[in-house]
Structure formats: structure tokens, C-alpha cells
């Protein structure tokens, strides 16, 4: 990793401070100048025929098969949806899956347990299914504990509320059910992360939970482990008596997990399959952009844990295909992101206006990377006597990530990117752009330069996105160009490098992006291309780098002193009366339990306890600069 950083330091992109002042880049000479040779980028040096790149299309197939043009990413992704004989079949049933039908009431299927006469009867172990679900110990695509994982024990945790239970220090039964402990061992996870140490006993004691935790801290396991464990021990409720002609087609899940994006719910579902192995609980996933008929057929096979995006779930509720009357556990994952995406009306309709049990009759777990005013209001309405959990410095990036900021003008970005990719030829790389057109353009450019790349963005179909992600995870296309659709929640093991080709306008988006590397205690590199077009986030960049003990380039300090940055993404911008504060530092209340502040919402005073105050300065919320990210994927990080 240090070799890569050293190579980046040597990149001939000119001195940032000089560029900031408008000076020409050192080492570049017009072709007509005498006495100085023309600059040749490192990725073109030592190549025959003037640096021409031999075509590698024969190695990776034509453009129509994957890495180029509009059909880029068309890779074989069979097995991306486990237990499915047809594309997009995302339930446990189906050909090759955990078995169709009702595993709870009919004859048992491989890997599917039963609940019989008030007792949980786990299925017998199945070697084939275990290999498909958990892989093998030597599988590099399975990421468990990283080299810095023990450092997580030093992360401070603050749990507030009445009667906070003692945290656990290991995955043991009790308090966990023996089956979930076995499945955790199969996943090769040896110790709980800080959020899991607290969430397991909190849920086991019947309490509600509002949790903020730093990126890569195991939030998905933080709710799946205790919810599944309690489900195994307590079993399902009886299905209500039929009412109406179509009531027999309804499913009555015990647990509901809502998350904002297709990618995130798919990854949570993949993890739920692992940890529900051999149990009576059958997980299902539903999301927009995929065939609803296929998803309904999966639901008809049985669904005990439903993972859903709010829009598709609302559609299924209106069709009479899902009943929430048996919900014991409600989980809102990335709650702040769901509200940012405009899902609050759908969420409130689902929770408050459908047949879901009231707040006193269910357990509610809310996980949010940030805690602005609208999330506080949601917690007030959806949770009862909850415990507030703040893990680590939620408002900062992980020190496992080495951050490097390069001053690069827009017309030089492609050349510098090729230099970076040439220096970092190991591991997976994610490149973030701001627009869909740039994502496609850049992936085509990289392909033409001999770098196998694929892209995902909002205009690609779910099938295309799944195939592109499958190719990236497998290493067939080790470079993924992505827009913000993949910035949050997307968890892919062994991502060693994240490049912000285009910096976002908000600092919290930057932190969520670079959080795709350095996960589970592993180390990673994040490179950002900065120029004067990004001066609106310069203050936030400086604070981030300082908090994470990273080098702050001189050109950032210089541009910051000019005082020419704007409010978007900087400090001082407000959203609905409350900015998005940096969490976890000193008197800044972003990751604190607002119930202790006594300041209420939207007060105008100047005390640090005023939440969302328009005049509270550093004592209240500030602009978009809080971060942290729940995730899931091939691991539960």
C-alpha cells in the first residue's frame, strides 16, 4: 500500500499550489520547444510503437459482451441471486434454492428448518448449500476480519437511555440462539464489532434502538443477528384468519427491513440467507426496477423476513400481497438516506397507516449514518423508550483509509487516472463520477486503453447492474465506474482503491464514497481529483483530512484562505432549518442523544444543545459533513 502512495506522490501533475495560482504544470513542454523532451505519462512509457496499447479485447470479449459501449457489463451472473433457476428470482424457493413451498408447514427442504409444536427444528447441515452460501475458507472474495480489526476494541461507544444492558464480548449462546452462532462461525467472523456488542443485548431485552456508527462497523449484522436470533427462539405468530377472496395469497412476515436502494436491499437479503440457513425463517427481497410478477411468486413460496425498498413494498401492500399484521421487528436501515431520497411519505404510510402493529407492540431498530432534525422526528414517532447508540467518531472517516488529494484540472483527469491505475494493479478499484454520461464515457475510455472496466448508474436496468456488479466482484472487470447510486450501502470485499474522479458537492457524500474501501478493519486508498471547481468543499476536506490524521495539501490550505468557497456542501448551509452536522466531536451534537440536550427542535439560541438552530454556530448542526455507512453484501459489513 505504501508503494502505491509513493508512486502517487511522484505523479507528474504539477504542483497544486502553482496550479491554484494559474502557473503552468512542470514537465510539460510544447512540441516545438527545444532542449526538453515531450512529457510521456508513466502508463505509456516503455511501450513499443510510441506507447500504443495492444488490444486486450480478445482477453475479455468484444464490446457487445461487456466492457465497452452501451452493453458494457453483460457478464454471466448466474448465482448472483441464490436459489434461483431464472433471472431475478430472489426468494429461497425456486430451482436449486432452499426449497419452494412452505418450509414451516410442509415436508422439510434441504437447508430449511421448521417450527413445529412451539419448537424450532433446524434442518440438517447441507454441504452443498454451505459452500454456495459461505464459500470456502481460502476464497478471497469473502472478507471477514481485516488486519486492523482488533483496533475496533478501542473505538469509544456511548449508549444512552434507561437501563442500558451490558454489552457482549463474543458470539455466544446465550444471549444468541445456538443456530445463529453456528452460522456466524460458518461466515468466519470471530468477534462482534462495537455496534453488535450492544445491539444484541438491546434487542434481546426487548428495547428499541437508534444507532449511529462509523462506516464499515457491521451495522447489517447489528440488526440481523439479534432479530434472527430472537425469531428462532420465539417462533412465528399464527396467521390471521382469512378475510376476503384474496387473503390466502398474502404473506405475513415476522420481520421487515426497509432500505433505500435496490443494491442495499439485495445485499441485506444475501446476508439474511446466510444467517437464516437451516432455520424456519425464509427471507425474501422486493425492490423496484425488477419484474414484480417474479417477486410475487417468490413471496407466495413463503416469507418470514422481508427486505424491501419503500416504493415496491407500498405497491405490494396496495395489491394485497403483503400483510404487516404479524410484524414483531421493524428495521429502518440508512434512514437518513431514505429521507434524503424523498421516501418519508411512503415510510410513514407503511408504518402508520397500514396494518402494522403500533409502536408499543413491536420492536423498532433505526440505523442512520447521520442524525439531523428529520431523523430525530422520525425516531420520536416510530420508537418507544429507545436506547441511543453512538459508536466511534461517526462524523469522520476511518483511519484505515489512506486519503490522497491531487490537484488535477478537468482536461488532465483521464491521463492522471491512467497513471493511478497503472501504479495500482492489484485489487478492485471503484471510480466515482457525478454524471451517468461521464460514467459511460470513462468506462469506454478505460476499455480502449486496455483496462477492463464496467459501469453502473441509474439508467441501467437492474439486470445490467447485477451483471456489472457480478463481473466486478469476481475480478473479471476489476474497475467499476459508478455514480452516486453505488456510493452508499454497496459493500464489495477487497476494494483496495477508491477514486473520486469528480468530487461530490457534499462532504458527507465524499465520505460515504471512500467508505467503500478500508472496510471490516482492512486498509485501503482513496484518491480525490481536486481543482478550483471543488472549492465549495475545501473547508470540509481540510477538516476531514485533519480528523483522520491525513496529510493536508498546501493547495487546499491556500484556497481555503481565499475564502471563496460557497455554502453548498461547505459549512453553514441549512436544510429544513437544520444542517448536516459533523458527528461525534466535542460539543457538536450530531451523534448525541438529542433527548439529553433539552433544546428541542429548531430553537434559535446559541447553546450547543440547540438542535437545528439557525444561529448556533459550531454548537449546533452544520452543513453536509456527517457520515458513516451501513452496508452489506458478500459480508455483513
Swiss-Prot record:
Keyword set, alphabetical order: ATP-binding, Cytoplasm, Helicase, Hydrolase, Initiation factor, Nucleotide-binding, Protein biosynthesis, RNA-binding
Main subcellular localisation: cytoplasm
UniProt xrefs under SMART domains: DEXDc (SM00487), HELICc (SM00490)
Start and end residues of each Helicase C-terminal domain: 400-560
Disordered: annotated segments: 1-121, 567-637
Keyword Hydrolase: yes
DEAD box, short sequence motif: residues: 333-336
Catalytic activity of the protein: ATP + H2O = ADP + phosphate + H(+)
Gene Ontology CC: cytoplasm
Compositionally skewed regions (Low complexity) per UniProt: 14-27, 75-84, 606-637
Pfam family, one: DEAD
Enzyme nomenclature, EC number: 3.6.4.13
Coiled-coil boundaries: none
Biased composition (Gly residues): 85-103, 567-589
Residue stretches spanning the membrane: none
Domain Helicase ATP-binding span(s) in chain numbering: 200-389
Class of this enzyme: hydrolase
Chain sites annotated for binding ATP: 213-220
Xref: InterPro entries: DEAD/DEAH_box_helicase_dom, Helicase_ATP-bd, Helicase_C-like, P-loop_NTPase, RNA-helicase_DEAD-box_CS, RNA_helicase_DEAD_Q_motif
Top-level lineage group: Eukaryota
Motif window: Q motif: 169-197
Compartment(s) where it occurs, according to its Swiss-Prot or TrEMBL record: Cytoplasm
GO terms, molecular function: ATP binding; ATP hydrolysis activity; RNA binding; RNA helicase activity; translation initiation factor activity
Role played: ATP-binding RNA helicase involved in translation initiation. Remodels RNA in response to ADP and ATP concentrations by facilitating disruption, but also formation of RNA duplexes.
Sequence similarity: Belongs to the DEAD box helicase family. DDX3/DED1 subfamily.
Name of the protein this chain belongs to: ATP-dependent RNA helicase DED1
Organism listed in the record: Meyerozyma guilliermondii (strain ATCC 6260 / CBS 566 / DSM 6381 / JCM 1539 / NBRC 10279 / NRRL Y-324)
